[in-house]
């Protein structure tokens, strides 16, 4: 690992070992070969149920993690791994956090995906259109240097997630 600023390296609190998001780019590639992908999302284990709150920066992921602290295990508030297993889909915490430094390497069975939208009122809206769900998931996907092979595996996985995992829009204030 190379860094020309020793003071920054020794201070710690880096979101990546290389001070550039190369680790997530490398992991995103490897996950495709292991029936997995990496999403811009907050994941929690709520009473043994994995909930995935999906959103871009400033979308409310860290806010929800803060609200759920003490009520659910925070896996990570910014980057979550999803993998297909023999038991179904699981979410895994990562070290690549946002504003909430609570992270866990634990996993939980994925029970629902909630796409975050800021609103003046709180609503939970079920999503039924699988193509819409697929498009939404693709827009939050952490991508490596893409190849045809990676896209084939990842698209297949995203379509499978869209078909099997309940998805919602969570509007909240």
Model-flagged regions — what are they?
Residues 1-28:
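Charged, amphipathic alpha-helical linker segments immediately N-terminal to NTP-binding catalytic cores
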Residues 12-14, 36, 126-130:
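Short hydrophobic/aromatic-rich motifs at helix boundaries and adjacent loops
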Residues 23-24, 37, 155:
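Short, well-ordered alpha-helical scaffold segments within catalytic/effector domains
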Residues 28-43:
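Conserved NTPase motor "head" modules and their coupling/switch loops across ABC/AAA+ ATPases, GTPases
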Residues 40-56, 66-173:
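Glycine-rich, often acidic-flanked micro-motifs
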Residues 59-61:
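Conserved glycine(s) of the Walker
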